[in-house]
Amino acid sequence: SLYPSAMYRLEGYLKGKPKILENLNYEFLKKQDGYFVEIIIEKVNKKYNFPLMSKLTKEGIRDWTNDMENEYMNVDKTTLEEIIKYHKIEFKIVRGYYYNEGRNYTLREVIKKLFDKRIKAKKYNNPIQNIYKLLMNSCYGKCLLKPIDTETKYVSNNDYNTFVSYNYNWIKEGEQLNDNRWKFKLYKSIDDHFNLVHCGVEVLSMSKRIMNEVLCLAEDLDIEMYYTDTDSIHINNSKIKLLADEFKKLNGRDLIGKGMGQFHTDFSSDILKGEILAKRSIFLGKKCYIDELYGSESG
């Protein structure tokens, strides 16, 4: 539940209209509710194996790298705070927008309610828990919705001529499915498309903060991490207690658990018994790997 946890921790979405940033002083920015700015990174004083900074290559690929000196980067409030905290960067603000009209804290209340309902449903193996999960993730995903520039229509043979005569300017392609039905793909106007991309960006950045607190601490403790994805880390089981203890010292809360913002083993099996771990893993690329599992009580 990474994104629901991020929304809960974010507390609320920004209210009001963005204002053009004229005061390029970071001390001014820190006092605002939120901001989205372009910075130029002058110096990176600390590097990580899993860098928190990125840039686009000439091929359009996002490259996560420590080599960011004299590079421009677009950041929101959370991201800038993170790279200052962990990479110890020195930077200048180039331009941007800021918000200073508060936040709508209804988000936190709604997410907590849905999260608790899902926990209760999972306890009784009620499949409605999947609906609660979808609702929570949609509170994030809907904010970043890209323009939908096509729509699909199914038309019977009897209505074919009428449909084509009224819509010929918008038809992208058509396909006859059977003796009595056609499938048309039409161009759709995006003039009235609207999203809340700034809200989605803040949720994504907060989700990365949740991961950064674990990833960066583990690296500072010289704990090896073999692979990390959106909401998971492959790490030696023998090092988890050390990581959890240090995490609690730093943050004043438990790392391990199934509550909001906590981490737990994600392996499950109907065959293996006891604590389920991976004895070996083969990684081929992003989201392409296999784990060989065993159970502490079944081998």
Annotate each language-model stretch with its function.
Residues S1-G299:
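Conserved acidic
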